[in-house]
From Swiss-Prot:
The cysteine framework is XV (C-C-CC-C-C-C-C). It comes from the Eukaryota. It comes from Hastula hectica (Sea snail). Expressed by the venom duct. This is Augerpeptide hheTx5. GO terms for cellular component: extracellular region.
Amino acid sequence: NEVCPPGRCEPYCCDPRKCKCLSIDFYGLVCNCDS
């Protein structure tokens, strides 16, 4: 499985089954993924 790096949220890394796209001030959309 693709590892989700920190940074802008991308569909290929933000698998909705495992990851959430969060909108954070000053950073924009980021991937937040549970291990």
